Amino acid sequence: MLNNRNVLLCVSGGIAVYKACALTSKLVQAGANVKVIMTESACRFVSPLTFQALSRHEVYTDTFKEQNPSVISHIDAADWADLIIVAPATANVIGKLANGIADDMLTTTLLAATAPVWIAPAMNVHMYDHPAVKRNISVLYQDGYCFIEPSEGYLACGYVGKGRLEEPENIVKLAEKHFAEETSAPLEGKHVVITAGPTREAIDPVRFFTNKSTGKMGYALAEAAVQLGARVILISGPVSLDQPKGLAEFIPVQSAADMREAVLSVYDASDIVIKTAAVADFTPKTVFDHKMKKQDGGMTLELKRTVDILKELGEKKKEQILVGFAAETQDIEHYARKKLAAKNLDLIVANDVKANGAGFGADTNIVTIFFKDGHKRELPIMSKLDVSFEILQEIAALSKQTGERS
């Protein structure tokens, strides 16, 4: 239930406004305190009086109409909200938000918001597929907004396709799940080890070779795991990120050998190990004591294989849940499932690093989770922190099942 949760519903101008009326009613029935902001266009479809009657609060329609002279309306509304839902969100309002435009009560309030913002698009199927709209949605994902994907069906314009505002009862369920997860700690008492970032393999005192990993996915997982109640040890290669707050231990490493040593030192005491680090497969056979000087002609650098840490953990595994990552460029499912089986993993998270919004350094990701029992779960583009929560919820469920069987 949503007892005493403050939900700010922002309604922009589209035919789906009628569904926003039902959403207001269902949120109130679930126990939420609901306030509504309407754009000028939204008021052309439904009277503000309708939302006032359903929410039992006066409706915001004008930035310059200060309902309470002791506060500034758009700041007060933003501070009041525990959750903000923009439904329906038109292409116009999505474009404004993506570009920081604040020219009405809705957009001005969202610029001042610190609560989570969910955007529920509703528009013609071709508008939703337009490159400009997709670009704006991608920007908002990177800014930390969450999206409630539109459903497919008959649209008011006569087309059949993706663009229908999600059903109000489903949005309410998502809100209930959000607040339930916020107050729960499904990983409480669990010892979680997460590896992140690249490794550096020294050639000489000046040079090394590495990879494009930035550590963002691993650090997001560590942050989320702490929030879900876990005791988190983060083992990180060299990155330019701040340590997540609340870690039990932070272990910085440089090379693949360092990473292996650190992981093995904490493995036996762990309940869950998540290996997001991009560990080098090869390292120089000889590390030069002094800087190598330029020479005429070419140069041959002899390499040797590093130890496959994930495979070694799979062989040593007792009751731990072992999670791997697969950053691929082709045949994603084939290589992910092969790695899942070969390394005795419980699940593996795979992505196509060439896809827009899913590569190294991006703040978003598009992943598929493959499970040991053969099923998979595809996630849409979302922030790496949101991806982390989804992954960890799956791990928590798996941990619970494992505990019930043992």
From Swiss-Prot:
<dbReference type="Pfam" id="PF04127">
    <property type="entry name" value="DFP"/>
</dbReference>
<dbReference type="GO" id="GO:0015937">
    <property type="term" value="P:coenzyme A biosynthetic process"/>
</dbReference>
<protein>
    <recommendedName>
        <fullName>Coenzyme A biosynthesis bifunctional protein CoaBC</fullName>
        <ecNumber>4.1.1.36</ecNumber>
        <ecNumber>6.3.2.5</ecNumber>
    </recommendedName>
</protein>
<dbReference type="GO" id="GO:0004632">
    <property type="term" value="F:phosphopantothenate--cysteine ligase activity"/>
</dbReference>
<dbReference type="GO" id="GO:0010181">
    <property type="term" value="F:FMN binding"/>
</dbReference>
<dbReference type="GO" id="GO:0071513">
    <property type="term" value="C:phosphopantothenoylcysteine decarboxylase complex"/>
</dbReference>
<feature type="binding site">
    <location>
        <position position="339"/>
    </location>
    <ligand>
        <name>CTP</name>
    </ligand>
</feature>
<dbReference type="GO" id="GO:0004633">
    <property type="term" value="F:phosphopantothenoylcysteine decarboxylase activity"/>
</dbReference>
<keyword id="KW-0210">Decarboxylase</keyword>
<feature type="binding site">
    <location>
        <position position="281"/>
    </location>
    <ligand>
        <name>CTP</name>
    </ligand>
</feature>
<feature type="binding site">
    <location>
        <position position="325"/>
    </location>
    <ligand>
        <name>CTP</name>
    </ligand>
</feature>
<feature type="binding site">
    <location>
        <position position="343"/>
    </location>
    <ligand>
        <name>CTP</name>
    </ligand>
</feature>
<keyword id="KW-0456">Lyase</keyword>
<comment type="similarity">
    <text>In the C-terminal section; belongs to the PPC synthetase family.</text>
</comment>
<feature type="region of interest" description="Phosphopantothenoylcysteine decarboxylase">
    <location>
        <begin position="1"/>
        <end position="191"/>
    </location>
</feature>
<dbReference type="InterPro" id="IPR007085">
    <property type="entry name" value="DNA/pantothenate-metab_flavo_C"/>
</dbReference>
<dbReference type="GO" id="GO:0046872">
    <property type="term" value="F:metal ion binding"/>
</dbReference>
<keyword id="KW-0460">Magnesium</keyword>
<keyword id="KW-0288">FMN</keyword>
<keyword id="KW-0479">Metal-binding</keyword>
<feature type="region of interest" description="Phosphopantothenate--cysteine ligase">
    <location>
        <begin position="192"/>
        <end position="406"/>
    </location>
</feature>
<keyword id="KW-0285">Flavoprotein</keyword>
<dbReference type="InterPro" id="IPR035929">
    <property type="entry name" value="CoaB-like_sf"/>
</dbReference>
<comment type="pathway">
    <text>Cofactor biosynthesis; coenzyme A biosynthesis; CoA from (R)-pantothenate: step 3/5.</text>
</comment>
<dbReference type="GO" id="GO:0015941">
    <property type="term" value="P:pantothenate catabolic process"/>
</dbReference>
<dbReference type="InterPro" id="IPR005252">
    <property type="entry name" value="CoaBC"/>
</dbReference>
<comment type="function">
    <text>Catalyzes two sequential steps in the biosynthesis of coenzyme A. In the first step cysteine is conjugated to 4'-phosphopantothenate to form 4-phosphopantothenoylcysteine. In the second step the latter compound is decarboxylated to form 4'-phosphopantotheine.</text>
</comment>
<comment type="similarity">
    <text>In the N-terminal section; belongs to the HFCD (homo-oligomeric flavin containing Cys decarboxylase) superfamily.</text>
</comment>
<keyword id="KW-0511">Multifunctional enzyme</keyword>
<feature type="binding site">
    <location>
        <position position="291"/>
    </location>
    <ligand>
        <name>CTP</name>
    </ligand>
</feature>
<comment type="pathway">
    <text>Cofactor biosynthesis; coenzyme A biosynthesis; CoA from (R)-pantothenate: step 2/5.</text>
</comment>
<dbReference type="InterPro" id="IPR003382">
    <property type="entry name" value="Flavoprotein"/>
</dbReference>
<keyword id="KW-0436">Ligase</keyword>
<dbReference type="InterPro" id="IPR036551">
    <property type="entry name" value="Flavin_trans-like"/>
</dbReference>
<dbReference type="Pfam" id="PF02441">
    <property type="entry name" value="Flavoprotein"/>
</dbReference>
<feature type="active site" description="Proton donor">
    <location>
        <position position="157"/>
    </location>
</feature>
